């Protein structure tokens, strides 16, 4: 089974423009993310796929592998699908470009779904972690997910789901961790589907998959991703790097 990681890297980030090219301890954010993915030794290959000459040159000039894509993509997974269409690969892992502290543990967890699925009944897997802090639960930047008894996703939302009308119902809240692992054909199928109202409303690409009746297997983790969405996040990442 050939497994690759692909890191979608769009230059014009809405909340923090050019964040992937920001300096983080002497290297750019995107280069650190690429090197972190390579260092896990879980993948047969690692690529950055980007619409930016700057990002492409940053990766290639430092010995990495990059693929240019068109600019007009609805999501990172769409960008990845374009890049891997002609690659000989079985599993494609979407690693977020703004996670320079990517570790092997959570990636191994999501890949375990496919290694324990000999009949190939699961096409897409992702991660979630339990959250209990009210601020985290109510933060629209923390995407919540609810699952069925078999740990397949029922819905993702920036809103609080489920709504806590009954405070003593014993509900657990889960934050979606944005690492996806696709079988290649499932990724190409995703790419062929048009955006519908749920994805457009929430701006969550995974809702496209659910809206067309597909299933996403969720794996619970304790991993806390260190994503860089704001200038404040970047400063925290710099402080964290100094402490390593």
Swiss-Prot record:
GO terms for biological process: CMP-keto-3-deoxy-D-manno-octulosonic acid biosynthetic process; lipopolysaccharide biosynthetic process. It is found in: Cytoplasm. One of its GO terms (molecular function) is 3-deoxy-manno-octulosonate cytidylyltransferase activity. One of its GO terms (cellular component) is cytosol. Pathway: Nucleotide-sugar biosynthesis; CMP-3-deoxy-D-manno-octulosonate biosynthesis; CMP-3-deoxy-D-manno-octulosonate from 3-deoxy-D-manno-octulosonate and CTP: step 1/1; Bacterial outer membrane biogenesis; lipopolysaccharide biosynthesis. Pfam families: CTP_transf_3. Keywords: Cytoplasm, Lipopolysaccharide biosynthesis, Nucleotidyltransferase, Transferase. Its EC number is 2.7.7.38. Its main location: cytoplasm. The keyword Lipid metabolism does not apply. Belongs to the KdsB family. Activates KDO (a required 8-carbon sugar) for incorporation into bacterial lipopolysaccharide in Gram-negative bacteria. This is 3-deoxy-manno-octulosonate cytidylyltransferase. It comes from Flavobacterium johnsoniae (strain ATCC 17061 / DSM 2064 / JCM 8514 / BCRC 14874 / CCUG 350202 / NBRC 14942 / NCIMB 11054 / UW101). The lineage of its organism: Bacteria, Pseudomonadati, Bacteroidota, Flavobacteriia, Flavobacteriales. The gene is kdsB.
């Amino acid at each position: 089974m050939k497994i690759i990681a692909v890191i979608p890297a769009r230059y014009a980030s809405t909340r923090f423009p050019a964040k992937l090219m920001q300096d983080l301890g002497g290297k750019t954010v995107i280069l650190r993310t690429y090197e972190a993915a390579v260092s896990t030794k879980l993948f047969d290959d690692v690529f950055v796929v980007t619409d930016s000459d700057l990002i492409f040159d940053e990766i290639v000039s430092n010995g990495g592998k990059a693929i240019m894509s068109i600019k007009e993509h609805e999501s990172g997974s769409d960008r990845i699908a374009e890049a891997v269409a002609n690659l000989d690969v079985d599993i494609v892992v979407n690693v977020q470009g703004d996670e320079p502290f990517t570790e092997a543990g959570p990636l191994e967890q999501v890949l375990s779904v496919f290694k324990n699925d000999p009949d190939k009944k699961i096409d897409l897997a992702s991660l979630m972690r339990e959250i209990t802090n009210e601020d985290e639960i109510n933060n629209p930047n923390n995407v919540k997910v609810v699952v069925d008894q078999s740990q397949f996703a029922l819905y993702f939302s920036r809103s609080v789901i489920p709504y806590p009308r009954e405070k003593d119902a014993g509900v657990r809240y889960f934050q979606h961790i944005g690492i996806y692992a696709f079988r290649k054909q499932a990724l190409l199928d995703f790419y062929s589907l048009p955006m519908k109202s749920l994805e457009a409303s929430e701006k969550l690409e995974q809702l496209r998959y659910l809206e067309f009746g597909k299933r996403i297997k969720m794996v619970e983790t304790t991993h806390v991703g260190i994503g860089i969405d704001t200038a404040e996040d970047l400063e925290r990442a710099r402080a964290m790097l100094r402490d390593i």
